[in-house]
Amino acid sequence: MKLVVRVKLLPTPVQVAALAATLHACNEAAEYASRVAFERNVKSRNELQKLCYHDVKDRFGLSAQPAVRVVKKVVDAYTTLRASIRAGNLGAEKSRRRVKAESKPISFRRWAAQPFDDRCLSWRLDARTVSIWTTAGRVKDLRFACSPEQLTTLRAHRQGESDLLFCDGMWFLIATCEVPEPEVFEPADWIGVDRGITNLATTSDLDNFQGRRLQRYRRWHARKRAELQVRRTKSAHRRLKKRARREARHATHVNHKIAKDIVAVAARTGRGIALEELHGIRDRVRPHRHQRATQSSWPFHQLEQHITYKARRAGVPVLLVDARYTSQMCPRCKHTSRSDRPTRDRFCCRRCGLAGPADVVAAVNIRDRARRAWVLVNVPLPTVA
């Protein structure tokens, strides 16, 4: 499986100037190549390279390999756009978003990331330095900082290109690593995981990961955003963007911790992980006006992604099951009714009297559905006589 390792660069002022000039030149060249691809409706990388290669080198001061990387970046951007249109991510054929996306060439920000392959970038992991091509010449002994685990991953699994990124006044390199996947084991049982807003995750083992602190953190950021939005200045706009990224990083960190704990328990006990199939839930449920921001910021899909990739690295099977009525069905007598859940937190079966936390009951139902689904999937096909 492919993973990325992000290391922080520690450049000197002279190196910063060279990196900034290189990033600006590459993205200006990408803007030019994007206009050519749009005006001539070019889809092939080889065809666009024939049209733009010499102009990109001469007009923007790029060497041969960076010019090739710029052309590939443009072609990949248009390929991604066409895939998004086919998937319906930009709406129907004449929708405003789709018409806007198709009516102009793709633009590249001055500080957009730029890929470098091994001909333009070399790593010296023991010295924790890199050597990178710039428009001012080769910059050597560019120091970087990373954890020992990241260094081990880079040394063992780094492959392909790395991206140069500038974000929030800091420089980063994002390296692609091809990590081998262990074989998925046969689960002895399953851990059901119910995802929610008040409780971000609740397992059938009674482990509860509450979301109150994350909600308070989001409300605090919302108040700060409102104060900055009133000012309507450029500095306020910059601070708003920084705060948005900080809030997203915090939510990602919380999801990483939850996923790590759940996968560790599953790997240690030899069990699989069962999750609800929640794709499209925002289209099916229309919340009240004062609940829309809370539901829109609910990071349930990101938590599913984190659990899935961490489970793949550990060889733990992951199964998605039907989410309907998991918190309204009694796991003992299978009686299903909305009245079985009188409050958000409490479940009480009207038929057999089983009572308990509603999220735990939902997690147990998810676990039971995974047991049945896994048995059906692994039943051998009948032999033809």
Annotate each PLM feature:
Residues 1-385:
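Nucleic-acid substrate recognition interfaces
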